Amino acid sequence: MLRKAKKTMVRTVFLRIGIGLVVLLLPLGYRCVAEDNGAISRGYEAVTTDFGNFYLDRGNLTKLGIGVGVAAVFANTEMDQYIRDKYQNSTRSHVTDQATNIFNISGTELALIAVPVYVGTYGAGLWLHNPTMVEWARKSVRATVVGGPALVFLAVATGGDRPTDGDSHWNPFQNTHGVSGHTYIGAVPFITAAKMSGKTYQKAIFYGLSTFPGLARINDDEHYFSQVALGWFLAYLSCAVVEKGTDRQEGRVHVQLAPVPKGLAITVQKRY
């Protein structure tokens, strides 16, 4: 059963990564080969930059370590169990069940919903010449992809159980529920929107919405608080490194040489 759960989780993450890379590498139009090659080059550069900023940057690794440490305190003491019992016995009701119904699907199903949404938004943005839609879709996919390996590793390495299966204490490599993948996948699009928003109230709304998938898991007794919190924090860090990579790329002058019919083309692009 454990082996099957691990295979399912790994398969889901690799599905997201594979389709995500396809989206990232989609050429921005078909007007010339040089433009297509430029899109592929930018997509590859964005992915490698994101992974470097997440897994090699000391500042990000420090933040991740702090997040894991805080989650460990909640998970390996009675704090997680107290929060779970308090909520289930005193707060959960028919009203909260109805309110969280929209998120009452598995992480795998949520991933399979998110991918077409991102692809559809990306395509619609290109068709409508709406750069905001394109940017949101690409950043959301990049964030989902970059944090995927960390999510899988931590979920398995911590070995946490669901509330209905056991206590919150970590049992390394004994289970796959130490981090809420549902929370992670569900939070990314809202955190991305928050980071793209220019007004404080808009940021507050989107950040608030980003917590709903995790709260639904707590309400449905599918995850402990620490598992949800760590899933959300991973989503936040993933979105932050994507934003960091985008900021670093702005202002660069890109010069590219590409073959075209009857010769070569040189393209020069500066981002603002």
Residue ranges, per PLM feature:
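Interfacial helix-start motif at the membrane-water boundary
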Residues: 95-117
